[in-house]
């Protein structure tokens, strides 16, 4: 009921807080950071209405360490946006945080940026510019490595500087990590937005979110569209440590 319009009250859904490792010869990136080591403290920074029940798992840093990953390979964490459940795990990652100017400003001043301000203190904030052309229907882009393997596209709407991250693998597979344009694959498959109240509470510009959602829906036959919080959306992506990492894995 609360994920998309038209849901049933008794529907039960698992919401994920995830991080995705994308490897590249010129340096690796994490897309978002999931839950962190100081999760309880981060939850206390939230308004009570936003304190949903959660299950604690291993942090992205713990999972990287468990497989012997060399963290010095990380260029940083590329955040789809700075809401708490996407940045909490930055608390144990001393690496640059990649974000847009609009998102940095939002995170530094908005009430929804309290956890971001806590975990980003003392860390490098690496802003990137919209220096590339429209990309797959989105109005502007930034090519991280200059080879089309990781392209960030301007989305906005959920937050002022929220983005979609497109990853193209050597196999030809393509993924679109759409952040919170929708929380569940139902939003893509049923072309369904969030319920009205959730749009009011969660989005800074619900109309722009709808535009981004429609753009994502149009790509679903050529791109694996991955809403951040739908566990099943990550099924095609190997879990870190389960197979040799080649291009991307989810901690």
Feature locations, PLM:
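Conserved beta-strand hairpin/beta-sheet module of binuclear metal-dependent hydrolase folds
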Residues: 1-62, 164-179
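Core dinuclear metal-dependent hydrolase active-site scaffold
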Residues: 18-23, 29, 38, 132-170
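Active-site metal-binding loops of divalent metal-dependent hydrolases
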Residues: 33-36, 82, 103, 157-159, ...
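Active-site metal-binding motif and surrounding structural segment of the metallo-beta-lactamase
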Residues: 44-99
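Cap/insert and terminal regions of metallo-dependent hydrolase folds
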Residues: 50-62, 171-251
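Metallo-beta-lactamase
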Residues: 52-73, 101-154, 201-222, 250
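Short, low-complexity, polybasic intrinsically disordered segments
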Residues: 87-98, 102, 239-251
């Amino acid at each position: 009921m609360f994920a998309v319009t038209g849901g049933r009250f008794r529907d039960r859904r698992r919401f994920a807080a995830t991080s995705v490792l994308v490897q590249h010869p010129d340096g690796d990136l994490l897309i978002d950071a999931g839950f962190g080591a100081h999760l309880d403290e981060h939850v206390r920074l939230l308004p009570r209405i936003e304190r949903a029940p959660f299950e604690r798992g291993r942090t992205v840093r713990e999972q990287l360490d468990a497989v012997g990953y060399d963290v010095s390979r990380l260029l940083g964490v590329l955040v789809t946006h700075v809401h708490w459940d996407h940045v909490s795990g930055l608390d144990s990652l001393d690496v640059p945080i990649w974000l847009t100017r609009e998102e940095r400003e939002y995170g530094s001043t908005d009430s929804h940026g309290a956890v971001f301000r806590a975990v980003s203190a003392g860390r490098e904030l690496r802003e990137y510019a919209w220096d590339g052309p429209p990309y797959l229907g989105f109005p502007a882009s930034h090519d991280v490595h200059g080879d089309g393997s990781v392209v960030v596209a301007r989305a906005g709407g959920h937050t002022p500087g929220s983005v979609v991250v497109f990853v193209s693998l050597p196999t030809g597979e393509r993924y679109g990590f759409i952040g919170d344009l929708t929380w569940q694959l139902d939003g893509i498959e049923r072309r369904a937005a969030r319920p009205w109240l959730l749009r009011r509470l969660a989005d800074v510009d619900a109309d722009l979110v709808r535009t981004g959602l429609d753009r994502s829906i149009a790509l679903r036959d050529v791109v694996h569209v991955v809403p951040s919080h739908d566990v099943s959306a990550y099924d095609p992506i190997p879990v870190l440590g389960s197979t040799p990492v080649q291009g991307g894995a989810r901690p």
